[in-house]
């Protein structure tokens, strides 16, 4: 009996692995029509008795402001061009910070955020963390860095029911994703830790300070020139 159950379990794992690889390969070239987070927000609104209309318009890489691309990396994941989905230095720093008490600091890379927003449910469990690591590894191996950032910018939440750079730019500033200024891009990046509480168009003093810090980091990273590193700077994880 146990042997039969174990065999069935292995079959489930095998077919899940095959299906997830095929899905990730598909989304390398096809825009994801929706994400798990979008479904979650929609269902939440139904149960709350206040259904929302999701705002989202996919736009290709060239139709997104370079300032926004750099601002998001500056604010969320400065080592994005170099790592393979996991920033172990940031993880160690976050653990040390959290052990000292105070506010909880996360260390999720952009790749990890794409994995959980696109494929997974909210919550904290070992199963979810394991699946997040699996999907993160897949997209890092099967997608170029530019594609990971493109999907992130088109799927991240920027306000209640507002997903992606195009919808966010029009919702907050009345411009296209391509037309975002450096300052507007920094404000959008500044609210990403908590976009349902903070507003890019009506920033608190904290958000304004964080946006100013992000603009400073953008300059230190080299501005638009930092985008050149996206598909060239990464080394194999076993290399020196």
Curated annotation (Swiss-Prot):
Keyword annotations from UniProtKB, A to Z: Cell inner membrane, Cell membrane, Cell shape, Cell wall biogenesis/degradation, Glycosyltransferase, Membrane, Peptidoglycan synthesis, Transferase, Transmembrane, Transmembrane helix
EC number(s) reported in the record: 2.4.99.28
Location of the protein in the cell: Cell inner membrane
Gene Ontology molecular functions: pentosyltransferase activity; peptidoglycan glycosyltransferase activity
HAMAP family: PGT_MtgA
Similarity field: Belongs to the glycosyltransferase 51 family.
Name of this protein: Biosynthetic peptidoglycan transglycosylase
The organism of origin for this protein: Pseudomonas fluorescens (strain SBW25)
Gene symbol of the encoding locus: mtgA
């Amino acid at each position: 009996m146990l042997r039969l159950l174990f065999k069935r379990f292995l079959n489930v794992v095998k077919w899940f692995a095959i299906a997830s690889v095929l899905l990730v390969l598909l989304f390398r070239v096809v825009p994801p029509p929706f994400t798990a987070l979008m479904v979650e927000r929609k269902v939440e609104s139904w149960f709350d008795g206040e259904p929302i209309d999701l705002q989202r318009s996919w736009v290709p890489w060239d139709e997104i402001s370079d300032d926004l691309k750099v601002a998001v990396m500056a604010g969320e994941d400065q080592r994005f061009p170099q790592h393979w989905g996991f920033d172990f230095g940031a993880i160690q720093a976050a653990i040390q910070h959290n052990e000292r008490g105070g506010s909880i600091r996360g260390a999720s890379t952009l790749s990890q955020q794409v994995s959980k927003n696109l494929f997974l449910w909210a919550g904290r469990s070992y199963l979810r963390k394991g699946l997040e690591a699996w999907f993160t590894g897949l997209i890092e191996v099967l997608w170029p860095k530019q594609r990971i950032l493109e999907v992130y910018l088109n799927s991240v939440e920027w306000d209640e029911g507002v997903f992606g750079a195009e919808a966010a730019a029009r919702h907050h500033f009345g411009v296209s994703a391509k037309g975002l200024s450096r300052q507007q891009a920094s404000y959008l990046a500044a609210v990403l830790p908590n976009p349902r509480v903070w507003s890019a168009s009506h920033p608190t003093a904290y958000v304004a300070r964080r946006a100013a810090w992000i603009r400073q980091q953008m300059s230190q990273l080299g501005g638009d020139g930092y985008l050149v590193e996206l598909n060239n700077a990464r080394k194999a994880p076993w290399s020196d």
